[in-house]
């Protein structure tokens, strides 16, 4: 275990749950932060509560290191963002080559606010679930963006901050495998049953890969990754 404290950007989805488990294996104390920005899939905020409770109940060693959860009201982001994540509109590609689920500046703002909380609480490692492999092309998920942001935050705060992105260079199948290696089949099942990824907020029938509509970009990535992981894991 690494000495020190970390703050995890935690949405209640598969990726951030895996990153939270990763942090709990590595740091003496871990806190979480979430954001309510009027997202259409608001059910993810309920999922994050369920996931935190399940982690505390099923993983005693992690529970001892899991500290406070911080929820930030970012309604203003929803007010200035006309996207399929904050409006009841169909998901489609834009002329810029990005899906209209892209909320401009979202991750930049998330990390800035996380750093402000971390500054106050002595949490100088910020952990996020961004990646450049199985992703929708969002520019604020790119490694170069986050490295530049790490420098800007450290300069602007007058303290050294580190941004950790454990999933940056692995695909969704490898993300499922990371979860299994961190917490065994119990963590995998927790992710299937309790986390939420679907952009449409569907919590109906439980699929092998979890809840969701099965059609939106988030569900498609999660489903395909689970199928590849299952094929590899059972081969």
From Swiss-Prot:
Report the GO molecular function annotations.
Answer: ATP binding; ligase activity, forming carbon-nitrogen bonds; zinc ion binding
Q: Which Pfam families match?
A: QueC
The protein's UniProt keywords, in alphabetical order, are: ATP-binding, Ligase, Metal-binding, Nucleotide-binding, Queuosine biosynthesis, Zinc
One Gene Ontology biological process: queuosine biosynthetic process
Extract the InterPro entries matched here.
QueC, Rossmann-like_a/b/a_fold
Residues at which Zn(2+) binds: 198, 213, 216, 219
Q: Which domain of life is it from?
A: Bacteria
Q: Record-annotated residues binding ATP?
A: 10-20
Q: What is its EC number?
A: 6.3.4.20
Instruction: Cite the cofactor comment.
Output: Binds 1 zinc ion per subunit.
Provide the catalytic activity annotation. Answer: 7-carboxy-7-deazaguanine + NH4(+) + ATP = 7-cyano-7-deazaguanine + ADP + phosphate + H2O + H(+)
| Cofactor(s) needed for function | Zn(2+)
Q: In which pathway does it act?
A: Purine metabolism; 7-cyano-7-deazaguanine biosynthesis
Cite the NCBIfam families for this sequence. 7-cyano-7-deazaguanine synthase QueC
Write out the similarity annotation.
Belongs to the QueC family.
Protein's job: Catalyzes the ATP-dependent conversion of 7-carboxy-7-deazaguanine (CDG) to 7-cyano-7-deazaguanine (preQ(0)).
| Name the record gives this protein | 7-cyano-7-deazaguanine synthase
Q: Which species does this protein come from?
A: Paracidovorax citrulli (strain AAC00-1)
Name the gene for this chain: queC
């Amino acid at each position: 275990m690494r000495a020190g404290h970390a703050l995890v950007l935690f949405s209640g989805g598969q990726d951030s749950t895996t990153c939270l488990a990763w942090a709990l294996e590595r740091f003496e104390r871990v806190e979480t932060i979430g954001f309510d920005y009027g997202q259409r899939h608001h059910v993810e905020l309920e999922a994050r509560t369920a996931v935190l409770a399940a982690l505390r109940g099923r993983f005693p060693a992690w529970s001892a290191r899991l500290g406070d959860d911080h929820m930030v009201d970012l309604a203003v982001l929803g007010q200035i963002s006309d996207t399929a994540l904050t409006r009841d509109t169909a998901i489609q590609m834009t002329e810029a080559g990005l899906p209209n689920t892209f909320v401009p500046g979202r991750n930049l703002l998330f990390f800035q606010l996380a750093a402000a909380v971390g500054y106050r609480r002595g949490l100088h490692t910020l952990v996020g679930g961004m990646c450049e492999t199985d992703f929708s092309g969002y520019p604020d998920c790119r490694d170069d963006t986050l490295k530049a942001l790490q420098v800007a935050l450290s300069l602007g705060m007058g303290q050294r901050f580190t941004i950790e992105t454990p999933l940056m260079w692995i695909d969704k199948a490898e993300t499922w495998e990371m979860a299994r290696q961190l917490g065994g089949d119990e963590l995998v099942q927790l992710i299937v049953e309790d986390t939420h990824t679907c952009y449409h907020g569907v919590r109906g029938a439980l699929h092998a890969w979890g809840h969701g509509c099965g059609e939106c970009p988030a569900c498609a990535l999660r489903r395909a990754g689970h199928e590849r992981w299952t094929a590899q894991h059972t081969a």
